[in-house]
Amino acid sequence: MVAVIIKGNEVAEKKRAQLTEEVVKLKEQGIVPGLAVILVGEDPASRSYVKGKEKGCEQVGIYSELIELPETITEERLLAEIDRLNGDDRINGILVQLPLPKHIEEKAIIERISPEKDVDGFHPISVGRMMTGQDTFLPCTPHGIVELVKETNLDISGKHVVVIGRSNIVGKPVGQLFLNENATVTYCHSKTQNMKELSKLADILIVAVGRPKMITADYIKEGAVVIDVGVNRLETGKLCGDVDFDNVLNVAGYITPVPKGVGPMTITMLLHNTVESAKRAGVVCK
């Protein structure tokens, strides 16, 4: 058996086409979705991510505003910029590109963003609403992962989901989203003693640890859905995931590649959240 490859780039493009149609309808009502991205410093990776977000906004018709601030900016000045954007009716979503310089407390910055504009889904209020199954902005990568699994037409309810990794950005929230879909969820992490045995029980395996090709065929239940969140660069310069793709391909039922798997879905779900925020606000732009 050779696994079906879940092409995240194709799923993302399909969803972006739907978003484009939604934005056209909103603009007919005088509503223009707007996203503000704050970039602090000159980190090349952060700048690359921001460019991808700007390109995505342009593609679907979202107004985007990039605020570039120096590495030396004070926390107070950054908080004041967020306050300004919180009060700007043209802006439906505020995203602060992470990581931030060491002298700025990330927690304070995230908590300053209005929950109504928290399109990253990182604010504690957003997290609390997600945990209790309320309507809220879902974190983009975990939301994208659930959407990719749904593309397989697998009924998630009752399935065993194993999440390898427990980061606040991917591991913890993605498990909660699957729990909200009535799956049974097991978390594995660096202190888990029987990871291989637990992994082999998974109908759906999510891997987000940042270790190249860590997961091999002997971790996989035959026919399982395998979602590889890792993005690692080998010495050759080639990108690879946390899953040994070629090794697992003949055991899994479905698998995401790296690149063109989970990555394209992250920005797409950010665009989705921004459009949803604009719908909720319903502010007509003059």
Swiss-Prot record:
Keyword Membrane tagged: no
Pathway annotation: One-carbon metabolism; tetrahydrofolate interconversion
EC assignment: 1.5.1.5, 3.5.4.9
Pfam families: THF_DHG_CYH, THF_DHG_CYH_C
SUPFAM superfamilies: Aminoacid dehydrogenase-like, N-terminal domain, NAD(P)-binding Rossmann-fold domains
GO cellular component labels: cytosol
Family: Belongs to the tetrahydrofolate dehydrogenase/cyclohydrolase family.
UniProt-recorded name of the protein: Bifunctional protein FolD
Superkingdom of the source species: Bacteria
Positions that bind NADP(+): 165-167, 190, 231
Keywords carried by this UniProt record: Amino-acid biosynthesis, Histidine biosynthesis, Hydrolase, Methionine biosynthesis, Multifunctional enzyme, NADP, One-carbon metabolism, Oxidoreductase, Purine biosynthesis
Organism in which the protein naturally occurs: Bacillus cereus (strain G9842)
Catalytic activity: (6R)-5,10-methylene-5,6,7,8-tetrahydrofolate + NADP(+) = (6R)-5,10-methenyltetrahydrofolate + NADPH; (6R)-5,10-methenyltetrahydrofolate + H2O = (6R)-10-formyltetrahydrofolate + H(+)
One annotated GO molecular function: methenyltetrahydrofolate cyclohydrolase activity
InterPro entries: Aminoacid_DH-like_N_sf, NAD(P)-bd_dom_sf, THF_DH/CycHdrlase, THF_DH/CycHdrlase_cat_dom, THF_DH/CycHdrlase_CS, THF_DH/CycHdrlase_NAD-bd_dom
